[in-house]
């Protein structure tokens, strides 16, 4: 079972439906016991960093102890960072060293919304069957700054920013696989296969 952690954000139905489409059994939950027993965990997207991290901190001992694959989507990926500057400066989970910052005005329209391409920067099982140049769907005003060693894909929006990161059992995407058509479903299927191992 894959636990989709409910920390008060939107988009829970679309990610659970997409995972079910690729054969996963899912449970949307904030119950620490269910999360502890899951074979994979998803931190979904769409919401504010501050309120999400406050809710996660209530079950921090449980999520810090997880050794199963964890997928962070959009806000979920940003929560992996050391800190975020969204609405102030807030400590993140610090699973992937980095800082979440707002796009500079020089990029043009913020939020970055719509389809954009991936540039794969290193091999990663989560991206099996996905090629550079394929389109995925974004909705965000903030992005993670992190070392290249953790970056598996980048995307250009006036600046090159990390659109995919990976460290140990933590995998994060700034885009929404559940809204990214066949490419997104392939990525979610890869995650399910990683979880099954």
UniProtKB/Swiss-Prot annotation:
Q: Can you quote a single GO CC term?
A: cytoplasm
Q: What does this protein do?
A: IGPS catalyzes the conversion of PRFAR and glutamine to IGP, AICAR and glutamate. The HisH subunit catalyzes the hydrolysis of glutamine to glutamate and ammonia as part of the synthesis of IGP and AICAR. The resulting ammonia molecule is channeled to the active site of HisF.
Keywords of this protein's UniProt record, alphabetized? Amino-acid biosynthesis, Cytoplasm, Glutamine amidotransferase, Histidine biosynthesis, Hydrolase, Lyase
| Residues covered by the Glutamine amidotransferase type-1 domain | 1-197
- The catalytic activity of this protein is classed by the Enzyme Commission as 4.3.2.10, 3.5.1.2
**Which GO BP terms sit in this record?**
L-histidine biosynthetic process
Gene Ontology terms, MF aspect: glutaminase activity; imidazoleglycerol-phosphate synthase activity; lyase activity
Q: Which reaction does it catalyse?
A: 5-[(5-phospho-1-deoxy-D-ribulos-1-ylimino)methylamino]-1-(5-phospho-beta-D-ribosyl)imidazole-4-carboxamide + L-glutamine = D-erythro-1-(imidazol-4-yl)glycerol 3-phosphate + 5-amino-1-(5-phospho-beta-D-ribosyl)imidazole-4-carboxamide + L-glutamate + H(+); L-glutamine + H2O = L-glutamate + NH4(+)
Q: In which pathway does it act?
A: Amino-acid biosynthesis; L-histidine biosynthesis; L-histidine from 5-phospho-alpha-D-ribose 1-diphosphate: step 5/9
List, alphabetically, the CDD domains matched.
GATase1_IGP_Synthase
Record's subcellular location: Cytoplasm
Chief place where the protein resides: cytoplasm
Question: Would the keyword Hydrolase turn up in this protein's UniProt record?
Answer: yes
User: Active site: which residues?
Assistant: 74, 176, 178
Task: Identify the species of origin.
Answer: Archaeoglobus fulgidus (strain ATCC 49558 / DSM 4304 / JCM 9628 / NBRC 100126 / VC-16)
Q: Oligomeric state and partners?
A: Heterodimer of HisH and HisF.
Q: Which gene encodes it?
A: hisH
Identify the SUPFAM superfamilies for this entry. Answer: Class I glutamine amidotransferase-like
Report what the protein is called. Answer: Imidazole glycerol phosphate synthase subunit HisH
Q: Which InterPro entries match?
A: Class_I_gatase-like (IPR029062), GATASE (IPR017926), Imidazole-glycPsynth_HisH (IPR010139)
